[in-house]
A protein has these predicted regions:
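Short linear elements at protein peripheries
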Residues: 285-331
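Acidic/polar loop patches that form or flank catalytic/metal-binding clefts of enzymes
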Residues: 97-100, 111-118, 172, 179, ...
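Amphipathic alpha-helical surface "interface" segments used
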Residues: 40, 123-130, 266-270, 305-309
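Short alpha-helical basic/polar micro-motif
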Residues: 63, 172, 222
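Ferredoxin-type iron-sulfur electron-transfer modules in oxidoreductases and energy-metabolism complexes
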Residues: 132-161, 176-296
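Short coil/turn segments at secondary-structure boundaries
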Residues: 117-121, 249-252, 296-301
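Phosphate-binding glycine-rich loops and their immediate beta-loop-alpha structural context
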Residues: 164, 168-171
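The feature marks the mature, well-folded catalytic cores of soluble enzymes
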Residues: 1-157
Length: 331
């Protein structure tokens, strides 16, 4: 799952098999040109019979009363011109003052998303077809939705995330997203930007767990074309999640208390602040291998997680290896 390339997690062989199973397509080969031809023929027939087309909006221009759709495939143009009714869904943060402002954003979006200078298709829609027009919808409706975006705008920190132009650059450079993919986030917006937007839009209680995905390496902040400090915002959201935002870190009534997490950190603190305890913990860490292998399936806390993941084995001589590392001062 990727906001620019939704099928990036599939290769051409898998896509060919999906076309064969779902569309009944006869595949001579699974070359990209052949797959594109199948998709084009199938979708065109669907578009010709549609009465209503639903699209998103890249940028809306209030002065001109128009909105801008960017694409490379052509399906967006079919969706907005072939049906009699076109409904465009637009987040309030995508509204610009003028065409010039939107053009500046487009000049950032396309190179950051796909490396192109300009997209293949630029659709600037000003309304339904006029008298004498041969094509286009008879009705155009624009729905502006908020979904807590105005609350983000009023926040002293999180308003910066509303600058996002949905280029996906932060995902392309995120080492965590590269390993787990977009579906692991289980939200509309994956990757670093999703870790900021999703808790604000859908609620930190519902999507706050994805904040733990971030390694805080900061690569996303470096490549963002609109300079959103993503790593800093993720860190602030983590503080909010555990009740340490604007509230006292100790004794705050709204702390999302997790007894097991609190116990684990308490034990870690005991070991990490005493040299002899820390050395003892490292020397016995390999016993954890037996615990994982024999008890992981029985403990409901980690049963589901371990069904899809496999922990690396801890070496028996880990303590000695750490001592032997050059430059490490071990007290």
């Amino acid at each position: 799952l990727h906001i620019v390339v939704p099928a990036i997690h599939r290769n051409r062989h898998e896509i060919g098999q999906i076309f064969k199973d779902k569309l009944g397509a006869k595949l001579e080969n699974d070359e990209p040109e052949s797959l594109n031809a199948i998709a084009r023929d199938h979708l065109r027939k669907d578009f010709e019979g549609l009465k209503l087309g639903l699209s998103g909006v890249n940028f809306a221009m209030s002065r001109e009363g128009a909105f801008w759709l960017i694409e490379n495939e052509g399906n967006g143009r079919m969706c907005t011109t072939a049906p009699d009714i076109h409904i465009a869904l637009c987040g309030v943060e995508k509204v610009m003052e003028s065409f010039e402002d939107a053009a500046t954003m487009v000049s950032l979006l396309t190179p950051s998303a796909t490396g192109q200078f300009i997209p293949t298709y630029n659709n600037i829609i000003t309304g339904p077809r006029k008298n004498g027009d041969l094509d286009g919808p008879k009705e155009v409706h624009v729905i502006l939705f908020d979904h807590n975006r105005t609350k983000m705008l009023a926040h002293k920190d999180y308003y910066e995330a509303l600058r996002c132009i949905r280029c996906g650059a932060c995902m392309n450079f995120c080492p965590v997203y590269d390993q787990i993919g977009g579906h692991a986030y289980q939200t509309t917006y994956p990757g670093p930007i999703g870790e900021v937007i999703s808790p604000n839009i859908f609620g930190i209680d519902h999507t706050g767990d994805i904040l733990n995905f971030c390694s805080l390496c900061g690569r996303c902040s470096e490549v963002c074309p609109v300079q959103i400090p993503l790593a800093d915002l993720i860190r602030k959201l983590r503080c909010d999640k555990i009740g340490q935002g604007e509230n006292p870190p100790m004794g705050a009534k709204n702390i999302h208390h997790n007894a097991m997490e609190a116990f684990a950190f308490k034990q870690f603190k005991k070991a990490a602040t005493k040299g002899e305890r820390w050395r003892f913990a490292l020397s016995k860490a390999h016993y954890f291998n037996w615990f994982v292998q024999n008890l992981s399936g029985a403990l409901p806390v980690i049963k589901k997680w371990y069904a899809f993941k496999e922990l690396p084995q801890i070496k028996k001589d880990l303590y000695k290896e750490i001592q032997a590392i050059e430059g490490v001062i071990y007290e």
